[in-house]
């Protein structure tokens, strides 16, 4: 368990010092959870396309 915790801390440390990962301005801090989920949306729509095709083919 400590190894997993250490990996998570190392990962957070890398992202905090990386110039490609920025922080939102204070005025937009309330949108931080939404911004964390936004990169997953294309993956979900891609998976939804497969589910839709499976549902259509079973008719």
From Swiss-Prot:
The chain crosses the membrane at residues 30-50. It comes from the Eukaryota. SUPFAM superfamilies: Photosystem II reaction center protein K, PsbK. It holds the Pfam family PsbK. InterPro entries: PSII_PsbK (IPR003687), PSII_PsbK_sf (IPR037270). GO terms for cellular component: chloroplast thylakoid membrane; photosystem II reaction center. The keyword Thylakoid applies. One of its GO terms (biological process) is photosynthesis. It is a single-pass membrane protein. The keyword Plastid applies. PSII is composed of 1 copy each of membrane proteins PsbA, PsbB, PsbC, PsbD, PsbE, PsbF, PsbH, PsbI, PsbJ, PsbK, PsbL, PsbM, PsbT, PsbX, PsbY, PsbZ, Psb30/Ycf12, at least 3 peripheral proteins of the oxygen-evolving complex and a large number of cofactors. It forms dimeric complexes. PANTHER family: PHOTOSYSTEM II REACTION CENTER PROTEIN K, PTHR35325. One of the components of the core complex of photosystem II (PSII). PSII is a light-driven water:plastoquinone oxidoreductase that uses light energy to abstract electrons from H(2)O, generating O(2) and a proton gradient subsequently used for ATP formation. It consists of a core antenna complex that captures photons, and an electron transfer chain that converts photonic excitation into a charge separation. This is Photosystem II reaction center protein K. It comes from Pinus koraiensis (Korean pine).
